[in-house]
Amino acid sequence: MKIAVEIFPTDQTINPVEFARTAEGLGFESIWFPEHSHIPTSRTTPWGGNVGAPPLPEFYRRTFDPFVALGACAAATTTIKLATGICLVAQRDPIHTAKEVASVDALSNGRFLFGIGYGWNKEIGRASCRERV
């Protein structure tokens, strides 16, 4: 069985490199880091899209860029797979994203897993769609 572990790496959590080394040492198959680069100042979508959810936790605003964090982890580990869980592709420039994906994959010797998605925050999705159309 392959088991993975995910955290929201921020300046207030365990260092991503320390996390990756520990997970690798414990035999986990992969680590997954999310992406939350755009937090609207005015949000009506409840956290996680769930009606009645509490306010958005502060760590969302402090989340490290997954490609930078995973690149650091790639340099510090040898076997654990490194993944985005998830990369919000609709919010990103496709050329920069392709370069970042290729870079982390090359620096990790093919250990990168590219998890993608759209996310749950409707305000972000609306803005991204307007900008790209």
Regions found by a protein language model. Give the residues of each.
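Short beta-strands and strand-loop turn motifs
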Residues: 2, 82-85
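N-terminal beta1-alpha1-beta2 module of alpha/beta enzyme domains
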Residues: 1-76
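Glycine-rich "substrate-gating" loop/helix at the edge of Rossmann-like oxidoreductase active sites
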Residues: 57-61, 87-92
